[in-house]
């Protein structure tokens, strides 16, 4: 997947709410995986000052509008209070954002019935689907979470739902959503070296020749080592204005990686056309 180009090589902002969407067949039915664009609006409450009622209302309205496009009940989507951890929660209970959002950086729906969201603006929004059980997951994989094992923990939680004799990677599919790329994620040399000692694929150099981290490559290394079929949505948040980026425009907002069960009677428009 590449960025649509506008005048003078700038990224074109699409009218639709998604920068990428796919439908996946599982043993228990079809599910959608998708990543929103800036056209869907800021979906993160924490970007808005807590005393700014109008801004908080805009986030709530954006979430409701997105759920209408997804074809799921209002308030059904589980959002997380993300803290750059390796903690995974089950997607059961209320968890409707705000104060009730569980503190974690990954969530698993045992049967895929709960719509899941993970919010980012340079970190990786990873979606995982188990085609054999229908279970679904999302994970927030920034530098800290990736190195601390959030993806391994997510895969382990999904595999725990299988019979003990079948707890291996085949049947799991993962999508590494848009994030800051190795050409743009400049870090101190010591930070790059420490990360590369843990995940060699993360070592990179920026397009201007300084030390960098390639988080998508590191995430792919982790997932493929666990036998997970992995695809990367090859779009850099810093380079592509269809997406929020903390490095390009701090504080503007967060987009979401999503997974939800398909309604056979609903038509979900594509946002990457």
Region annotations inferred by a language model:
Residues 1-273:
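Active-site microenvironment for binding and transforming phosphate-containing groups
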């Amino acid at each position: 997947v590449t960025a649509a180009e506008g005048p003078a090589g700038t990224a074109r902002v699409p009218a639709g709410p998604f920068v990428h969407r796919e439908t996946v067949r599982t043993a228990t039915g079809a599910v959608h995986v998708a990543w929103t664009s800036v056209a869907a609006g800021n979906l993160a409450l924490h970007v808005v000052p807590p005393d700014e009622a109008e801004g908080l209302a805009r986030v709530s309205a954006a979430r409701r509008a997105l759920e209408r496009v997804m074809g799921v009940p209002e308030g059904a989507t589980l959002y997380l209070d993300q803290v750059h951890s390796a903690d995974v929660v089950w997607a059961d209970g209320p968890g409707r954002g705000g104060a009730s959002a569980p503190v974690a950086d990954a969530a698993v729906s045992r049967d895929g019935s709960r719509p899941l969201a993970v919010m980012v603006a340079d970190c990786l929004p990873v979606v995982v689907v188990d085609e054999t059980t229908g279970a679904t997951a999302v994970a927030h994989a920034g530098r800290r979470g990736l190195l601390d094992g959030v993806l391994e923990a997510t895969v382990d939680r999904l595999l725990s739902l299988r019979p003990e004799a079948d707890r291996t990677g085949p049947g799991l599919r993962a999508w590494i959503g848009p994030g800051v790329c190795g050409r743009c994620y400049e870090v101190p040399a010591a930070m790059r070296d420490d990360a590369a000692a843990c995940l060699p694929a993360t070592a990179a150099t920026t397009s201007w020749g300084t030390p960098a981290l390639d988080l998508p490559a590191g995430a792919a290394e982790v997932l493929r080592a666990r036998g997970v079929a992995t695809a990367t949505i090859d779009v850099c948040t810093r380079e592509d204005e269809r997406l929020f980026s903390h490095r390009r425009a701090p504080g503007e907002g967060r987009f979401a990686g999503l997974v939800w069960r398909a309604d056979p009677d609903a038509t979900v428009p594509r946002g990457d056309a």
